[in-house]
Amino acid sequence: MPVFEASSIQSVVLHRVGNKATEEGYVLSTEPLHLTEQLQDVLVRYFLGPFKVEEYYRLYSDDGVEMNPLYRHCADIFSDPECLMESSCDIARLLYDASTHANIKGGELFVVYFSGCMFNGETMDAIGLFKSETKESFLKVLHGDEEWSRAESDAIATARYELEVQQGINPAKLDRGAIIFNTEAEKGYVVSVVDATNRTVDALYWKDAFLSVRQREDEYYNTHTEMQAYKKFVTDELPQQFEGVSKADQADMLNRCSNYFKQNDNFDLQTFTQEVIAQPEVIDSFKEYREQYQQEYDVQMPESYDISESAVKKQARAYKSVIKLDKNFHIYVHGNRELIEQGEDEKGKYYKVYFKEES
């Protein structure tokens, strides 16, 4: 995980970028922002606070990373931080050209140069790109001149108060952001991405059209991809290839996979298949599916690598083993497969569950 405890803003430029599809245009700043100490503290928390996941990307282009325009601008800035102002204007134009979906909201683009960022134990500079699209209402208290008087030992003042509704940015809610660390430049740098609005299809413009990134092939990537592929194999492929595979069987296989990744520091395909799958014919089926998965999704899946704890925690949500019975019951399977039996009688299908204590 990146560490930002010693990070500080060296320079920040603010532009307004609208929606190109609706011809909103963009407004470029003429100079960097002047930051007070208080504003610096607020902005550092606003910009860097959301970056807590160890999932990283690289700037990318099919024709070579040098053909990614954002990569070229970042390289210029890292080479000469004094050109941040000029390059930030070009970056704002790039974002405008990428904002072609009708649902994309206009907003403020912050282009920031940081120092003191730590990645993999090394301190380095970084470039931050942050877009604020959502405005929130807040109340501002207004009061007139105060008239002071003294009653006994208390100083008392009277004034006329009013409330005014204003619109502004909530510094606790970053809409979209990217941090480009000044390392591994020849591979497209190391990029961390935040997109709080990624529930809609048009949100892909931030990662794909503007940043143009691909996931960095590291331990997080390997762990995430492996667990994703195995879950898809168990839930989709296994029932088609082998008769009699029940939901309880699938839940048990997912639990064993989850436990393997939680209990080991390293992944080894041979050990994994023997401990988690065990049955030779199912092992062969999984290995064949694994090869097909890499081709279909254009991913690389090495046979051994270090396991990422944060990737395991994220995948744990998708690995919840739940058997849904009509609309009446949900059975959550966490452990011993031998304690749950499936059958059928004249009343219908049923599950029999053994337990020691009820709570």
Map each language-model feature to its residues.
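Short low-polarity hydrophobic stretches
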Residues: M1, V111, Y351-F355
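Long, hydrophobic alpha/beta structural blocks
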Residues: P2-Q315
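C-terminal, beta-strand-rich globular interaction domains
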Residues: I283, K287-S359
